[in-house]
């Protein structure tokens, strides 16, 4: 049986969608979830008849991967990541690669990268932006960590990520240690600031100017034609144009 190019642990919606995205780009993906029923439900549902290998133990997953093994962890940030790393280390060989695709704090990622590297393995902490739909259709990705790991995951990451109009991938190496999760933190801070500004603009237009939803849609649509052009401005305009059935 062909071995998988990458393994993915954690089959919540983000994990499922990333696995489907990778498979759609021609990669064979081994998947594992703490509850085996979730694995079975995935491969008999959305993952049916796809190049996805169901694994019911971590050992089964590690044995199903080509070397150097690449394992992406899509689990809740915090203690769960540390516990999973400890479970995986005895099953892995030197130069295998662990990837944290969750929203870990960059200081935790620095600590984990140093710890994993001290065991002879490589570590990547990557920001993944775009939510559930982005995970399926193309997220923005911000990988950082062990520099030697990048060559092994670059093709996969740049295949599944979003692309700008000229085809440039929305993914590149951002630095060592916790750089990937640091960049994601800054990205989120900017995004939440933009969202607050949009909320305030909406509030002023609605309460002070008395504009209707259609009129506010026109304002946001015009803003999106100029220097304020952005995904958030666009979807705000789209929401205001939506009519409930």
Short names for language-model regions:
Residues 1-69, 91-95, 132-135:
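NAD(P)+-binding Rossmann beta1-loop-alpha1 motif at the extreme N-terminus of oxidoreductases
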Residues 81-85, 99-100, 105-217, 225-245:
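Rossmann-fold dinucleotide-binding core
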Residues 60, 70, 80, 111:
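Residue-level recognition of oxygen-bearing side chains
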Residues 66, 76-77, 146:
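Helix-capping/helix-break motifs at membrane-protein junctions
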Residues 11, 32, 73-74, 101-102, ...:
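Glycine- and other small-residue-rich loops at beta-strand/loop junctions that grip anionic moieties
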Residues 72-87:
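Glycine/threonine-rich flexible loop motifs
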Residues 36, 58, 78, 106-108:
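The beta1-alpha1 cofactor-binding region of Rossmann-like NAD(H)/NADP(H)-dependent oxidoreductases
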């Amino acid at each position: 049986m062909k071995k998988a190019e990458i393994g993915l642990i954690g089959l919540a919606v983000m994990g499922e969608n990333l696995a489907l995205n990778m498979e759609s780009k021609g990669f064979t993906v081994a998947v594992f979830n703490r509850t085996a029923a979730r694995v079975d439900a995935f491969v008999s549902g959305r993952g049916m008849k796809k190049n996805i290998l169901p694994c019911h133990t971590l050992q089964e997953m590690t044995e199903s991967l080509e070397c150097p093994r690449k394992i992406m962890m899509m689990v809740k940030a915090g203690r769960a990541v540390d516990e999973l790393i400890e479970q995986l280390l005895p099953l892995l060989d030197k130069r295998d690669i662990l990837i944290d695709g969750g929203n870990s704090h960059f200081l935790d990622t620095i600590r984990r990268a140093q710890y994993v590297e001290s065991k002879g393995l490589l570590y990547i902490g990557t920001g993944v932006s775009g939510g559930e739909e982005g995970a399926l259709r193309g997220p923005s990705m911000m990988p950082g960590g062990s520099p030697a790991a990048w060559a092994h995951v670059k093709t996969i990451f740049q295949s599944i990520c979003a692309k700008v109009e000229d085809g440039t991938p929305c993914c590149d190496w951002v630095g060592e240690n916790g750089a990937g999760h640091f960049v994601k933190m800054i990205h989120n801070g900017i995004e939440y600031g933009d969202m607050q500004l949009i909320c305030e603009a909406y509030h002023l237009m609605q309460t002070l100017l008395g504009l209707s939803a259609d009129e506010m849609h026109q304002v946001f649509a015009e803003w999106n034609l100029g220097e304020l052009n952005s995904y958030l401005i666009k979807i705000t305009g789209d929401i205001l144009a939506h009519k409930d059935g």
